[in-house]
Amino acid sequence: MNKNNPTLKETLVAARQNYRKGDLKTAETLCYKILSINPNYLETKILLASISAQEKNYIKAKQLLNEAIDIEPNNVIILNNLGTTCKQLGELKNAIGYYKKAIQIDPNNTNAYYNLGATCYDLKQLKEAKSYLQKAIELQPNFALPFLILGNTCVDLKEYENAISNYQKAIDINYNLAGAHNNLGLVFRALNDFKNAISCYKKAIKIKKNHAGAHHNLALAFKETGKFNEAIKSHEMAIKYEPENLAHYFYLSDLKKDILDIDLKNKIEKIIRKNNTTKNNVAHGNYLLSKYEQKTKNYEKELNFLIKGHQFYFNSRKTKFETLVKYNFDDMLQIANGIEVEKLGEKNKYEIKPIFIIGVPRCGSTLVEKIIGSGEMFIPMGEETSVLEEFVTTKIMEKKSLNLGKVSEIRNELFNKYKKRGLISDKFSNIFTDKSLNNFFFLKFIKEIYPNAKIINCKRDALSSIVSIFRNQLTELAWAHDLNNIFKYFDNYLQITRNFNEINPNFVYELQFEKLVNNPEKESKKLMKFCGLPWSKKCLEFYKRKDLISKTASNIQIRSAIYKHSLERYLPYKKFLNQYGKKYSWFN
């Protein structure tokens, strides 16, 4: 090489070497030197676009790639990179177009199938995502990333066994893929396998010690198993690696209230004013600021911060949440009213004895479940399994009908689903709890499938529940981030349960939370009698259990003895909520 007068090819080699070393500035300078001599040097434009992408200047990267594709319209590498750049700019439909064009030119292009599958996953086009990712794996079975995203897709499809299998395959191919360990932990946690969940998070952290997400998830797992000191340490590690992520402070503040000092308040206000702060961060900043107002009993300001926080949180997941709101207020009502089963010649004999606990969030259902599960029999507690909802919605999609089929076949399928959750055991006479609160939508279905099932409707003062829902970040409940939707959801719940009870009197046990906490022994005895279970003092000593697990917003309170709740505690909020509740007789 002539160092005084290198060729363009030699200069490009030098630019690539500097790019690989991370010296982006020198690489960029060399690229522009080449383009000053030959403005249409294709490889240089591609490299310069990669440099811009590394610097997160995706607009510039897209411009350079468009210039490159004009030079060579059928270049699959450029099309792939254009798709990825559009994806970073949030132009997901354009990204899909580029990936599909790349596949049209090269039907065996693994990267294009992987990128297309990953983009469809981001758009929650799950069936399409699954198909494209499986094609990428077929073309290149030793490529770990498609297995990782396919695992994520299976989680969203509630195919937990397939998700576990795909994450494990990703790990087998590339053990150092920290995201696969972390996401595998999330599945184990969803299945209440906390031992394996915690192990997975720790492996992710060992591979990548600054994996803030894994530290956060480890903290939640510790919190849900009652290991609060370990949870605090893990939240603090998440903060160490993401000091401006306000979600970490929000979750830590539940366990360590003294962090809510003036210094943190100033930091929160500074962060949420930044132009590049994410909607999720602004949401958690407002949630935190509401806690300061709650401490000083400035109820109107507290609610205003909560309203703002929930708006930002909803908008950070707008596409997904708008779909879920429609599902909760339109689809679920149609399903509740329309699902049918075939009972011809069916016998009412079945092996399992489920105890369903229904209601709205923050109604005392966690307390009720722990009382039932802590008696002499120590029956398995399912918490919020979502088994019925997932089963019903999947069946409707498969059959394209509200007729779900024969009762006997449905019972067999549900038996297997509950068994996979570890809830069915001869040791406990196949008795277990399912505390999926929105099972009130499936009351008619439950009665037809399990005519001898026990159903407990947990009722609490509406104002208390509504304020508690709005104060707590119930992350995945799309309707819980808007007061109008909360009131509407309550009204649907009250109408559905009232209508069912009129047709089926005494089938559902109506439990009043306030009565339970004011007279726990008397009310818990009545409850256990209804369930057909023996009562003992252990029922009220649930908080002493070493194996107590709770993933609900009550997981801190549930580790203490029952205490009385004053209705007056929430009265100051009523005047601010009247504008939402005035059209509902049950609120006035």
Where are these regions (language model features)?
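PAPS-dependent sulfotransferases, especially Golgi type II membrane carbohydrate sulfotransferases
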Residues: 252-253, 265-276, 286-354, 405-423, ...
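Conserved alpha-helical positions within TPR/SEL1-like repeat arrays
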Residues: 16, 43-54, 77-88, 111-122, ...
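Conserved phosphate-donor/acceptor-positioning beta-strand/loop module used by diverse small-molecule
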Residues: 446-469
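Phosphate-binding active sites in nucleotide-utilizing proteins
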Residues: 348-448
